[in-house]
Amino acid sequence: MAKTSMVNRDIKRKKLAEKYAVKRAALKKIVSSQDATYEEKIEAATKLSKLPRDSSPSRHRSRCELSGRPRGVYSKFGLGRNKLREATMRGDVPGLRKASW
């Protein structure tokens, strides 16, 4: 089980990313625009750098919903590999079963 503080920190990062998503996308569009002047691009880049660091979506780490494990997470199910295996063996995941050939 992951530390509660790490899980909470990740939840906070996800909320911040959602909060600033529109503003961040608008500034990124200006920075990558061909039509914007050099001064506009520099201004947009400085505004982008002044946003909270944790508001970047790349700082969010996908975690297992049950255990909070940060690695080996299947995004389709939201579970780590160990918990996904346990759920599959119990028959909780429809259409998923152990491979046999």
Swiss-Prot record:
It holds the Pfam family Ribosomal_S14. The keyword Acetylation does not apply. GO terms for molecular function: rRNA binding; structural constituent of ribosome. Residues 51-68 have a biased composition (Basic and acidic residues). One of its GO terms (cellular component) is small ribosomal subunit. Gene3D superfamilies: 1.10.287.1480. Part of the 30S ribosomal subunit. Contacts proteins S3 and S10. Keywords: Ribonucleoprotein, Ribosomal protein, RNA-binding, rRNA-binding. This is Small ribosomal subunit protein uS14. It comes from Stenotrophomonas maltophilia (strain R551-3). PANTHER family: 30S RIBOSOMAL PROTEIN S14, SMALL RIBOSOMAL SUBUNIT PROTEIN US14M. The gene is rpsN.
